[in-house]
Amino acid sequence: MITNARVLQEDFVPRDVEHRNPEVNRLSAALEPLLSGEPAETPLVFGPTGAGKTCIARYTVERLRERLLDVRTTYVNCWTDHTRFRVLYALLDAVGQTVDVHRQSTPRDELLRRIRDRDDAPFVVVLDEVDQLDDPDLLYELCGVPHLHPILIANHEADFFAGLDERVQSRLRAGPRVQFDRYGLDELVGILESRVETGFEPGTVDRKRLEAIADAAAGDARVAIRVLRAAAREAEAAGAEALSDDHVRTAIPAARDAIKQRTVDALTPHQETLFELVDAAGEIAPGELYERYAEAVAEPKSRRTVRKYLSKMDQYNLVDARGEKRARTYAVVD
C-alpha cells in the first residue's frame, strides 16, 4: 500500500506546499535581500501546533538554496536544544566547526566568537520552538551577527515577547510577522491527498477516509498525517488492499497517543517534573504547583519561567489550563 514512507514522516518537506502561499510569500520576501547581497529581515513565525510553521519555513529555505548558491542553512529545535551551548554547538556543527569543541572545557564565548568569525557566506538558521530557550538573551547576540539570518518560530506572539527583556524585544519587534492559522477541513484533505498521491499505490485511499481523518485532526496537520500513517500500517498488517473506516477509527486514538508520548518525551527535566506533579495531583492551582515543584528540584526556575513551561504544555495539549488568573488550575489532558 505504502510506496514512499518518507511522505508520512514529520520532518518531510514536500516539493509543493498546499494552502500556504501567502505565508511562503511573506517568508520569501524577508529572505529576498540575500539574493542581492543585503541582510535579510528576521521573520517571526507564530501559530498553533500542526499549522505548518516548521514545514513552510524549511520549504522556503530550500527554495532559497535553489536560487542562492553561496548560502548555508540549518534547522535547530530549541525544545530539544534549549541551552545556550547546544544551540551554538548546532550552529557550528552545521558549518563543520565542532571537531575541537568540548562541552566542559570550551568557553561559551568561544562558540559565539567562531560563529561571528565565520562570515564567508550568509547563514540562514531556522530556530523552531524558540520560546523554549533557557537563555533568550542568546537571540540578541545571534541577531547581532552580520552574516547570520534567523527565522524564529513560536506558538504565541504575546507569550514569546513576555519572556524577553526590553533589549531583546527592541531588536526583534521590527521583524515581519508571519501568522499561521489552523487548517480548515478541506485544506487538510488537500494536504493528505498530496501525500497519498506521492506515497501510496493508486486506489488504496479514497477521499471519504481522508475527510474522516481530517475531521478527527481538528486543523492539526501533525495529527492528520500521523493518523494516515497509523491507518496505513493497520491496513498493511491486516493484508488489506485499501484503507477502511475501521482502519481509520483504530488509528485515531493510537495516533493521538503516539503524538502525546512524543511530546512528553521531549519535555526538559523541569517540564517533566511539572507534568508529573500535575498528573499526580489530578487538578492543581499554580501556587501549590510551584511550591511542590520547588521542593522537588534542586534549582527551581522562576515563577515566570514555570508559567511559560505550563503555557507550552497547554499549547501542545498535555495539560489543560482551566479558569483565569486566581481561579486558574491545571490538569493533565486524558
Predicted regions and their residues:
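Conserved catalytic segments around the Walker B and adjacent sensor/switch elements
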Residues: T42-L44, E66-W79, Q179
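A short, basic N-terminal segment
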Residues: M1-E41, D135, Y330
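Short, hydrophobic-biased segments on the C-terminal half of alpha helices
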Residues: V61, L139, R307-S311
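C-terminal helical "lid" subdomain and adjoining coupling/linker elements of P-loop NTPases
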Residues: E201-P202, K208-H270, K301-T305, R322-R326
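Mid-core helix/loop region of P-loop NTP-binding domains shared across ATPases and GTPases
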Residues: A57, T80-L164, S170-L172, F180-L188, ...
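Walker A/P-loop nucleotide-binding motif
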Residues: P39-Y59
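Short capping segments at the starts of secondary-structure elements
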Residues: A281-E288
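Terminal-proximal interaction/regulatory segments of ATP-powered molecular machines
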Residues: E291-D334
